[in-house]
Amino acid sequence: NDGIPDIIEAQGIPVTLLGTDADLDGLDDVFTTFVTPVDSDLDNVPDYLDLDSDNDGVYDLWEAGHPLLDVTLTDGQIDDVDLNIGINGLDNRLETAPDNFILNYTISDPDTDDSLFSYLDLDSDGDNCPDVTEAGFTDPDNDSIIGTSPTSVDNMGRVTGISNGYTIPDTDYSIGAPILLNTPFEDVAFCEASTSTISIDSTADTFQWEVSSDGGTNWTSIIDNTTYNGATTKDLEISNLQLSLDNNQYRVFLQRAGNTCNDTSNAITLTVEPLPTVTALVELKQCDDDTDGFSLFNL
């Protein structure tokens, strides 16, 4: 009762009935070859019986993409399903007509890059931030599975022994907001005493520049002052560059709405080129031994 037909959950791919039964076995010919139902998360509960087929702490019902929600009991089953279930076992509100088995919605697959429906995809929106994190749940070992592995589940496929999960999820898990660099972030070199700008070209919408003066061991968040300007923008201006900044490293902490994970850019190195040294003027004297007013000499 999660709103996803068992015929789809059995293999995790769309299945279209052929409408024929050549061998008269009572089954549509699409089932001529028996296929064992898949268990995507290997928890011994097949997907068609599993309320969380990928163990990310988000019910399949929420990840399915249909409009029928589970807000009353938050048990992973459609609210009031018993009042609307059809003869075929599917909620009539999800069909174009009762019991015609034609869905009036498309099963969610927002990233479309891995052939996985959202209810099977640990990163449904493809933004390199796991669903469990973006949904607002806890994954201490960062394996994209809710809780700490190895996991245990109940008879409905829900992970047990966890501190949260299986409540209404934050919506970030379904909003594709990857944090990327549009162009390489590379080392820079500027002249001493100049006012110069380092820029980062990223899909992020929030920036915090950081600096390290010890080879990247320790980092400090930059604030705007007489030396720096634009510490929370994509362009960091450095005024009156001093040789003391030579070999400093810079990086940017990046955030984007819709991506809970955030990211940090690679570090780049600043080279400060010293101004040329001007020596004192030297007076040169040369004898003109032939009194023609011209004389050759080497500098």
Segment roles from a protein language model:
Residues 1-180, 290:
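Extracellular calcium-associated, cysteine-rich motifs in secreted modular proteins
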Residues 231, 242-250:
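Solvent-exposed loop/turn motifs of extracellular immunoglobulin-like beta-sandwich domains
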Residues 211-240:
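Surface-exposed, flexible coil segments in extracellular/virion-facing regions
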Residues 194-202, 292-299:
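A short beta-strand segment in extracellular, disulfide-stabilized domains
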Residues 255-261:
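Short, solvent-exposed loop/turn segments at the edges of extracellular beta-sandwich modules
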Residues 183-191, 279-292:
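Short, solvent-exposed loop/edge segments of extracellular or virion-exposed proteins
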Residues 200, 209-211, 250-252:
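Core motif of extracellular immunoglobulin-like domains
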Residues 271-278:
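Extracellular interdomain linker/stem segments of modular secreted and single-pass surface proteins
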